Design a protein with these regions (language model features):
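Conserved NTP-binding/hydrolysis module of P-loop NTPases
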Residues: 81-120
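Mid-core helix/loop region of P-loop NTP-binding domains shared across ATPases and GTPases
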Residues: 106, 110-161, 165-172, 183-190
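Conserved small helical "lid"/interfacial subdomain of P-loop NTPases
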Residues: 220-248, 266
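DNA-binding patch around the recognition helix
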Residues: 374-384, 416-417, 421-459
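Short amphipathic alpha-helical recognition elements used for nucleic-acid or partner binding
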Residues: 381-412, 428-430
């Protein structure tokens, strides 16, 4: 918490990844599970799976912050944690080969920087270079990483790859080269990966390919799910604001359940109301629900697409007037893992008022046998990828004003931001999904020499 010109900052206002390890809250059991894998001989690869804004990136930053004075996994001097966000490379579209090039350049640079070495990297070829030359340069960058590892025999390299879905969209040699580092007889027992994904790895590639012995994805024997917070974590989080009383904390718990993002949203609005109690508490509650509604709807949509269940699953969870079917129960278990539902002797119930309200307002999905809804009906939210959704959400929060490229990058990628061209690709993909005519955008426009602006009248 800080002060600016005498105005106390909202300690729950920043819901971007936590960079300062002193502000990282809890997840002790999850960290212990990761460390158990990393301290094995040889270290084991680990996949962290969780919804958007569940704290995956913050956990990677926390691992990377390990020091001799504050070790996280046993001997801090043993581990080196190079970090790369693979998300931007997934959004390069037809430039996938160049995506592999940028990924390996960033991985080599992160490896050198983790050891405070100069990043003397091979020169990248021009955009119009032949495919074979790109592969040669990627291989040279991979060899650079190998050489760094080979020269530092007293370190174990744990590569932190955020949004590993990006790797699945790159040429297969990218994943093959990553696996080869773990198979090298000289360095393989000092290399492992901790990756994050918003979806189980089994959904990134065909099952047959995942089971291939030579597959990079076969390195991840198990996945750890980043779910709801426990009571101690929630209590520690709310201690950031001593202005809150016990009734406020109970109110926040009722609104957010045990879900990190919804607790932060609820806490931010309750905190503001406590300091400036204008209007009624209902106004603060409605504001929190309104802010979280798009995110809750996207979570529900992803769950119902992943699990086979009828639209009655939502009504069953809200009304609690019948026992759920086995398919519906699978959805409720998934909600429970996310801190959004609880089970007691009476059955399942929603643990978060925010989520319950978002579901009660969610229109049923139409049957595939019905004609499409008329044009006047409310539009279905665009099926954004994780990064597209993050960029769009930021632009929507700042609708009506120009956001510079650097401003967008700092908000979404506090560490390892993408190039301007990679950001432009993401913008173009967003336009494809929200513009009637993407070639002549009217909603998401570029302001020459400045940045991007989402018009206020955008749905």
């Amino acid at each position: 918490m800080s002060q600016n010109a005498g105005v106390r900052m909202n300690p729950f206002g920043n819901r971007k990844p936590v960079i300062d390890p002193r502000l990282f809250i809890g997840r002790r059991s999850l960290i212990d599970a990761v460390c158990e894998r990393l301290t094995a001989a040889p270290p084991q690869c680990c996949a962290l799976v969780g919804d958007a804004r569940s704290g995956k990136t913050s956990l990677l930053y926390y691992l990377r912050s390990s020091t001799a004075a504050r070790p996280i996994c046993a001997d801090a001097t043993r581990f080196v944690f190079p970090y790369v966000n693979a998300g931007p490379y997934a959004d390069l579209g037809a430039s996938q080969s160049h995506g592999a090039l940028y990924f390996w350049r960033d991985l080599a640079r992160a490896t050198a920087q983790a050891l405070a070495l100069p990043d003397d990297l091979p020169t990248l070829p021009d955009q119009g270079i032949a495919e074979a030359a790109i592969v040669d340069t990627v291989y040279a960058l991979k060899c650079t990483v190998e050489d760094i590892i080979r020269r530092t025999g007293d370190h174990t390299f744990i590569f932190l790859i955020d949004n590993v879905e990006g790797i699945a969209r790159l040429p297969r040699h990218t994943a093959s080269f990553l696996r080869s580092l773990t198979q090298d007889p000289d360095i393989g027992d000092r290399v492992a990966y901790v990756v994050t994904s918003s979806t189980p790895l089994s959904r990134l590639y065909p099952v047959s390919e995942l089971r291939e012995p030579s597959s990079f994805w076969g390195l991840f024997a198990s996945e750890l799910f980043i779910g709801g917070l426990d009571d101690a974590d929630i209590a520690a989080l709310l201690e950031r604001a001593p202005e809150l009383n016990d009734a406020d904390r109970a109110w926040i718990r009722r609104l957010g359940g045990a879900n990190l993002t919804l607790i932060l949203i609820a806490a931010a609005h309750v905190y503001e109301w406590r300091l400036h109690p204008t209007g009624s508490p209902d106004d603060a509650e409605r504001a929190a629900i309104e802010e979280a509604r798009p995110l809750c709807r996207s979570w529900w949509r992803e769950l119902t697409e992943t699990h086979t269940a009828s639209v009655d699953a939502r009504q069953s969870l809200i009304d609690q007037n019948r026992a759920p079917t086995p398919d519906e129960a699978a959805i409720f278990e998934a909600l429970h893992a996310r801190g959004l539902a609880q089970r007691d002797r009476h059955g399942w119930r929603i643990a978060s008022t925010i989520f319950a309200q978002a579901l009660s307002d969610q229109p049923d999905r139409p049957s595939t046998s019905l004609p499409p809804p008329p044009a006047a009906a409310p539009a279905t939210p665009p099926a954004f990828t994780h990064l597209e959704g993050e960029v769009y959400a930021f632009l929507r929060e700042n609708a009506g004003r120009v956001c510079t490229r650097d401003e967008v990058k700092r908000a979404i990628w506090p560490v390892s931001p993408p190039s301007d061209s990679a950001l432009q690709k993401i913008i173009e993909r967003i336009r494809d999904k929200i513009e009637p005519d993407p070639k002549h955008p009217r909603k998401l426009i570029a302001v020459r020499g400045q940045g991007y602006m989402l018009r206020r009248d955008t749905d």
